[in-house]
Regions:
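Class I SAM-dependent methyltransferase SAM/SAH-binding core
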Residues: 69, 75-121
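N-terminal, positively charged/glycine-rich alpha-helical extensions of SAM-dependent methyltransferases
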Residues: 1-34
């Protein structure tokens, strides 16, 4: 039997698998990206503060009965935080391409529904979730067609009136060709729907600056982050009634 040539989708999924395995095997040292590093802590606090502010702004603070999905959940760190925000474990679902990450997530919080799979083929029924979210997912995907398929799936499983929440890099990393900048224009094009409302804000001080400043002068790093001029990430919600 003649073997079919690999499609663009196959090649991109294979590249992502290789990239994530490299990261998890030591390409991203814990001492630099763990919360004991001041720059990482600044990033984490900024993300959480703006995430909660957005949910409050969009009247999404009563999470007890809401169904929540994270696409590209990794080991589930961010999804687990929603327990502190009032979400029930049985109403939270996470899916990730990497089986070993999901195994870790299940060991840390078995009450959440964790699935191994790709965001372009979500194993959920239409209109299943009140909140569908991703964190630093789309900037890792270099294939435009795969990004589009994942966006379509996120729309498909979102309930009418539900929110799509995205957090990602705004700019490409010149030192890392595996990262694509997700500008607001690119996000709008990717999730374009008639009547869709986009509410995005610029967050997270540029990592080179925060690494140089945060450990020496936390107040200065925090002030620079609040000024937003040197911020490199975006977070926001998309709503469609």
């Amino acid at each position: 039997m003649t073997q079919q040539p690999a499609t663009e989708l196959d090649l991109e999924l294979s590249r992502l698998d290789s990239e994530y395995r490299q990261r998890d095997s030591g390409g991203y040292p814990a001492e630099r990206y763990g919360l004991f590093d001041e720059a990482t802590l600044l990033h984490s606090e900024c993300l959480e503060r703006n995430l909660l502010a957005l949910l409050k702004r969009h009247n999404f603070t009563d999470l007890a009965g809401r169904r929540i999905l994270e696409v590209g959940c990794g080991s589930g760190e961010l999804l687990r935080r929603f327990l502190e925000y009032g979400a029930f474990p049985t109403n939270r679902c996470g899916i990730d391409l990497m089986a070993h990450r999901i195994e870790l997530a299940r060991s840390l919080h078995p009450g959440i529904d964790w699935q191994v799979g790709s965001g372009h083929q979500l194993p959920y029924a239409d209109h299943s979730f009140d909140l569908v979210m991703s964190f630093a997912l789309f900037s890792s995907i270099l294939s435009e067609s795969l990004r589009e398929e994942i966006a379509e799936e996120m729309w498909r499983v979102r309930k009418p009136g539900g929110l799509i929440l995205l957090h990602d890099f705004m700019y490409a990393n010149p030192r890392n060709p595996a990262v694509l900048g997700m500008t607001r224009q690119r996000i709008r094009q990717l999730f374009n729907r008639r009547g869709a409302a986009f509410d995005f804000r610029r967050i997270v001080l540029a990592p080179p600056i925060s690494r140089a400043v945060a450990a020496r002068a936390w107040w200065l790093a925090s002030t620079l982050e609040q000024l937003k001029i040197a911020n490199t990430h975006t977070i926001g919600v998309i709503n469609l009634e």
